[in-house]
Amino acid sequence: MTQHFPTRQLRFFLTAPSPCPYLPERYERKVFAHLPLSDGATVNDSLTQVGFRRSQNIAYRPACEACSACVSARLPVTDYAFSRSERKVLARNEDLERHLVEAEATMEQFDLLRRYLLARHADGGMAEMTWPDYVAMVEDTAVRTHIIEYRTRPSDGGPGELVACALVDLMSDGLSLVYSFYDPTLGRRSLGSFVILDHVVQAGLAGLPYVYLGYWVRGSEKMDYKVRFSPIELLKAEGWTLMSSRDLRPKDELPGL
C-alpha cells in the first residue's frame, strides 16, 4: 500500500522498549512522528489509514520486535447491521442529548473522566492523569477535533447531567474515536457500547464510511470489546480486511467445536 504525504518529509522516531500495558510479560515499542501544524489533518488522515493513531500532536503505531498483536480496527458504516442487542442499547439511551462542543477541556469532563478511570482502569497508566494532562489530551491537536458530550435532558432549564464524553477526530473518510469515557455507575445503559454505536449512526448521517476504533489486541481483555462489533475491518498486511465477530473468536468458543 503506497501513501503520499502532502507535506515536507516527516521524521519518524522509535521509542525504547517499555512494559506492554495490554499483554503480560511483553514489551512494546512505538514508531512516531510529530504532526505538522500546517497540514496536520491531511497527514493524520493518511497515517491513520495505514495504522497510526493520534495522541495530542503525535501520530504513532506499534513497532514491537516480537509481537504483532495490536491490529488497527474500524467499522464500515455502510455495511454495518445493528444486532438486536445493539438496537436495544440505542433505544435505552434515546433520552440522552448529544452536544457537539469545541475541543476545550472542562472540569466537569475531567471529574467524569476521573470517576471512570478509578472504577474501570485503576491499575492503568492513565489512572494518574492530572488536570494539565487532560487539557493537553483534549486541546493539543493539529487536526479537526471536537468533543461529543452526552447529557440527560434538563428538567430545570439548565444543562443536563453529563454521563459520557467522546474525544473525536473528524477525518476525510470517517470519525476516529480518540478516547471515550462515561459514568461507571450507569451500567444498565451500556454507555461504552452506546458511544460507539451512536458514532456509527452519526457517521452514516454525515456520509462518512468509517468509524475508527484504534487497536484491537488479541488476548487482551481490555480490548476484546472491539471485536464484539460486527462486521469490522482489520488492517492486515494485504490491507483493510472485512471480518465478522465469528472469524475473531477462539475456536474453543465457537458452537460445535
From Swiss-Prot:
Signal peptide, first to last residue: none
Disulfide bonds: none
Coiled coil start-end: none
Swiss-Prot/TrEMBL GO biological process terms: ubiquitin-dependent protein catabolic process via the N-end rule pathway
EC number: 2.3.2.29
Keywords per UniProt: Acyltransferase, Cytoplasm, Transferase
Entry's Gene Ontology molecular function annotations: arginyl-tRNA--protein transferase activity; leucyl-tRNA--protein transferase activity
InterPro entries: Acyl_CoA_acyltransferase, Asp_Glu_LeuTrfase, N-end_Aminoacyl_Trfase, N-end_Aminoacyl_Trfase_C, N-end_Aminoacyl_Trfase_N
Location of this chain's protein in the cell: Cytoplasm
Taxonomy, superkingdom: Bacteria
Catalysed transformations (reactions): N-terminal L-glutamyl-[protein] + L-leucyl-tRNA(Leu) = N-terminal L-leucyl-L-glutamyl-[protein] + tRNA(Leu) + H(+); N-terminal L-aspartyl-[protein] + L-leucyl-tRNA(Leu) = N-terminal L-leucyl-L-aspartyl-[protein] + tRNA(Leu) + H(+)
Gene Ontology cellular-component terms listed: cytoplasm
Pfam family, one: ATE_N
Function: Functions in the N-end rule pathway of protein degradation where it conjugates Leu from its aminoacyl-tRNA to the N-termini of proteins containing an N-terminal aspartate or glutamate.
Family: Belongs to the R-transferase family. Bpt subfamily.
Name of this chain's protein: Aspartate/glutamate leucyltransferase
Organism of this sequence: Phenylobacterium zucineum (strain HLK1)
Gene transcribed to yield this protein: bpt
